[in-house]
């Protein structure tokens, strides 16, 4: 054991709790949306994509981590590490790029930079394809030799190798690529879209250009998406910051808890988005009941 055995027991219990909550709420989101025709809107396609991403993390990542934490180290070997790292990275990236597509959709619908533009089913499907392509471009390279997945923190789950300059893996270039393309770029796009969105909502309220009902509906959707973005960032910013710090200080001593806490806090994002969706979407709640 790298740390006190009680820490592994606590980790296993935490992962069990995430599975216990994460699987039903994400499955419920999928089931209710597919069952009720009126919920099958282009916007909800992206929200469904988020639920699929979360199920990736729950089924492919959380179950593995719960099992390995019972043993006190990653017992599933190289193949298991690759699979767990892939599913966790894939789920997190699909969720992040889904939030980017949602932010762009909100910007186009509310701010109307393109006159007479409607966000249709075709646009939603293109958005879905885009999220998967971007997620794969982040999760696949470590499987084929550009960086690698290794056990991290308490050695119960696997992630990208921020820790070493292992020969032949080009870890440095991959980590820089990952931070610029798969972290900073989405953050900049989301920040731009919501900056414009806030201005547009204020201007529309002042000018009373649209009916009160339309404005209220758009505000509710925008509020829900903003909450999803904030909760996602609260979960993932600590992990990204610690990973970058470790990458910039390779060779220094880091305790196993140092990376484990933010990594497992990040995993809780799999339950936040569906809960926000269920709590803040009246139409969904009515269909669920």
UniProtKB/Swiss-Prot annotation:
Function description: Photoreceptor required for image-forming vision at low light intensity. While most salt water fish species use retinal as chromophore, most freshwater fish use 3-dehydroretinal, or a mixture of retinal and 3-dehydroretinal. Light-induced isomerization of 11-cis to all-trans retinal triggers a conformational change that activates signaling via G-proteins. Subsequent receptor phosphorylation mediates displacement of the bound G-protein alpha subunit by arrestin and terminates signaling.
Lineage: Eukaryota, Metazoa, Chordata, Craniata, Vertebrata
Residues in compartment: Cytoplasmic: 33-44, 105-123, 196-223, 280-289
Biological process terms in GO annotation: absorption of visible light; G protein-coupled opsin signaling pathway; visual perception
Organism listed in the record: Cottocomephorus inermis
Regions that span the bilayer: 8-32, 45-67, 82-104, 124-144, 174-195, 224-245, 258-279
Protein name as catalogued: Rhodopsin
UniProt key word Lipoprotein: yes
Domain of life, per lineage: Eukaryota
Name of the gene encoding the protein in the UniProt record: rho
Signal peptide (from-to): none
InterPro entries given in the database record: GPCR_opsins (IPR050125), GPCR_Rhodpsn (IPR000276), GPCR_Rhodpsn_7TM (IPR017452), Opsin (IPR001760), Retinal_BS (IPR027430), Rhodopsin (IPR000732)
Extracellular side stretches: 1-7, 68-81, 145-173, 246-257
